[in-house]
Amino acid sequence: ANLLGRSIIRSNSMTSTGPSEIGKFIAHDTLRDAQKEMVIDGINILFKQGFLLAAAPTGIGKTAASLASSIEVARNNQNQILFLTGRQSQHKIVIETVRSINSNLDKEISEVKVVDLIGRESMCEDVDKMTGKCSCEDGIIESSRQSRRDDMKEYILKKPNHVDDIIEKSKNKKICAWATARSAVKDCDILVCDYNHVFVENVSESSLSAMGIDLENTILIIDEA
């Protein structure tokens, strides 16, 4: 897996020697010099299957830069992107950034699809610790359940939605937000989730494969690495 740190301090030793193009997935009309350099570095390094670890002050536009370079490479190499963060505020920033990226795309480029996922206990109602089942879909007949999940999956992938929106919409449809979001992951470009999906071995082994994610064919963006 490739590792792309979300922040960067530029130094002479890190100057790019590769292409100067910043790609097509830019969230803002203009870029700061540091942002542009980070995007170019990220694209060059990820195309070489390397990793970039870096640090920079708050507000420099690190999230937008890391996403721009990662999506550019992922679209060329058919990778998925995992954006790992432990902060709810960062989940929202990623979703808003992807919305901005999509709004700036040329019409011939397909929009970026993202799934925002948090822990099951926060997405489901009354999870039974013994059986692992939730009560989200109680009273829904099987034939209706699948069609409702399909509708909800389409909603998730149609545009970037924060996990709170997914939970609320799923409750209104009497469908499990957690299960439906996980089913949408195999068709998305970016999964926003917690660190434990990669760094806690038993969680990683059970979770990633169930969602159809091949870690060896994935670009990682690690928030606050």
What are these regions (language model features)?
Residues H197, I213-A225:
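SF2 helicase catalytic motif II
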Residues D29-L46:
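N-terminal pre-P-loop "Q-motif" helix
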Residues K48-S69:
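Walker A/P-loop
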Residues F51, Q80, I190, I219-L220:
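Hydrophobic "anchor" residues on beta-strands that sit immediately upstream
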Residues L3-F25, D29-D33, N77-L191, Y195-F199:
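A substrate-engagement module of RecA-like helicase motors
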Residues A179-D189, S204-T218:
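Short basic/glycine-enriched coil/helix segment immediately N-terminal to the Walker B
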Residues I43-N44, T63-N77, T97-S100:
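Walker A/P-loop NTP-binding motif
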